[in-house]
Design a protein with these regions (language model features):
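Soluble periplasmic/extracytoplasmic beta-strand elements of cell-envelope proteins
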Residues: 50-52, 79-81, 100-103, 118-121, ...
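Segments of small-molecule ligand-sensing domains
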Residues: 248-306
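N-terminal hydrophobic or amphipathic helices and topogenic motifs
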Residues: 1-85, 94, 112-115, 123-124, ...
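Sec/Tat-exported extracytoplasmic proteins
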Residues: 71, 75, 97, 102-105, ...
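Bilobed "Venus flytrap"/periplasmic-binding protein-like clamshell domains
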Residues: 46-74, 125-191
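Short, flexible turn/loop "capping" segments at secondary-structure junctions
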Residues: 43-44, 121-122, 140-142, 255-260
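Pocket-lining segment of extracytoplasmic ligand-binding domains
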Residues: 105-107, 135, 172-260
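Acidic, polar ligand-binding/catalytic clefts
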Residues: 84-127, 131-134, 202-207
Length: 306
């Protein structure tokens, strides 16, 4: 009887030991899997993002509003920040205050260790130089001692205009610069208070179309546009065909050349990869259509990203 009891006790001990070993192995596996998940799996992407755009009347702001609607369909809330433009957008991105920003090509230098990454170029942005009536201009060097509006403070227009002028020896010391808004610029040109004004904007912009149609204002033909593109990789030479804006009214009245930069969308390097992919798919729908100077499907692309 004692032997039977002893054997039974041994069997129970063996069974308990087996159970402990099995459960111990299970717990060990669970712990290992949990550690792996914590180490390699990223947390879910946030549902709130911020984008630095531009002024309310500009293309960047309108693009951002369309992004907001598209992202809302995927449960993401996008806050659109109105800004002065590229320079302010770059500053907001660099300080980590926004997740996305539109930055005009060639205005800022994004370094390799920067917290900013270029996603894609989204459109051409021609450089228009509008002139008061009667002021004929063939070369930027002829702007010496003239009254020239170079765009508002903090804008990509100002940065690019000053850069182009400096390439031809024109600067604030030998030229009268002003920093007016679009509307004030148009008024000043019509009143002959300015000799010339730089505007960087899409050909689809109503401001550009109105200026080209205005008989009191002329637009410069950048005859040396090709030469500038060899001096700066982020500039393109584009020909605006006669009649492309309005065939019936024949606007513009003749072909002319412009320089063009690009509008680029940039993101924070810490932005969740899934969200970057989602934004790319939205960009293809918004920017993939053709316009007066761009073929369908040309944008978005990586040709002009920095």
């Amino acid at each position: 009887m004692k032997k039977s009891s002893k054997r039974s006790s041994i069997r129970r001990k063996d069974w308990l030991l087996s159970v402990v070993k099995i459960w111990g192995s299970c717990i060990l596996v669970i712990v290992v899997i949990t550690l792996i998940l914590f180490k390699f799996l990223e947390p879910p992407p946030p549902t709130d993002l911020k984008i630095a755009s531009g002024s309310k009347g500009g293309a960047y702001y309108q693009f951002a509003v369309r992004y907001k609607s598209a992202l809302a369909e995927h449960g993401i809330k996008l806050e659109v920040l109105e800004t002065q433009g590229t320079i302010e957008n770059y500053s907001l991105m660099k300080s980590g205050k926004v997740d996305l920003a539109f930055i005009q090509g060639g205005c800022v230098e994004i370094e390799n260790d920067s917290p900013i990454q270029s996603v894609a170029s989204v459109s051409y942005e021609p450089v228009w130089l509008f002139l008061r009536k009667g002021f004929k201009l063939d070369d930027l060097r002829e702007l010496l001692n003239k009254k020239v509006n170079v765009g508002t403070e903090g804008s990509g227009t100002k940065a690019l205009a000053i850069r182009l002028l400096q390439m031809t020896g024109v600067n604030e010391g030998n030229c009268q610069f002003s920093y007016l808004s679009y509307q004030d610029t148009v008024t000043a040109l019509k009143n002959s208070e300015l000799d010339a004004a730089f505007i960087v904007a899409s050909i689809n912009s109503q401001v550009i179309r109105d200026l080209i149609a205005d008989p009191k204002i002329m637009v410069m033909d950048f005859k040396r546009a090709a030469a500038y593109t060899y001096k700066a990789d982020n500039l393109s030479h584009i020909i605006i065909p006669q009649g492309v804006i309005d065939l019936e009214k024949n606007l513009p009245k003749e072909d002319f050349s412009v320089l063009s930069t690009s509008a680029n969308l940039c993101s924070s390097s810490t932005m969740h990869p899934q969200q970057v992919e989602l934004v790319l798919s939205i960009m293809a729908k918004i920017h993939g259509e053709k316009d007066l100077i761009t073929k369908k499907g040309y944008f978005p692309n990586a040709e002009f990203v920095e």
